A protein has these predicted regions:
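Amphipathic, hydrophobic secondary-structure cores in small proteins
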Residues: 4-7, 11-60, 65
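C-terminal structural segments of small proteins and small subunits
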Residues: 58-96
Length: 96
């Protein structure tokens, strides 16, 4: 995974693990990571995925309708090491 990636943030660690497994079953490269400080919400864990898989992630989101979803974010590591995080608006009904 590179310096540009997606983050799915949840309120429940159980949902983080379930969504990560659903992504992997669908062929999406995903991993559980600490939630970036800029999101500052949820259970402290999130699912990281490649932005190239954004469409597949949206399909898994629609198919599984995960509970406790806070939102999807686009993260970018700046040259100085800072992490910039912005809402993506993948989730159905999400207005980020």
């Amino acid at each position: 995974m590179d310096q540009h990636f997606g983050i799915a943030s949840f309120r429940s660690r159980q949902q983080v693990m379930a969504f990560e497994q659903a992504l992997r079953r669908s062929g999406v490269k995903a991993e559980i990571v600490n939630t970036p400080r800029a999101v500052a919400a949820g259970c402290g864990l999130s699912v990281r995925f490649d932005l190239a898989d954004e469409r597949a992630v949206a399909e898994v989101d629609r198919a599984t309708k995960p509970g406790n979803l806070i939102g999807f974010y686009r993260a970018e590591r700046e040259p100085d090491g800072r992490l910039t995080v912005r809402p993506m608006g993948i989730a159905e009904g999400y207005s980020g």
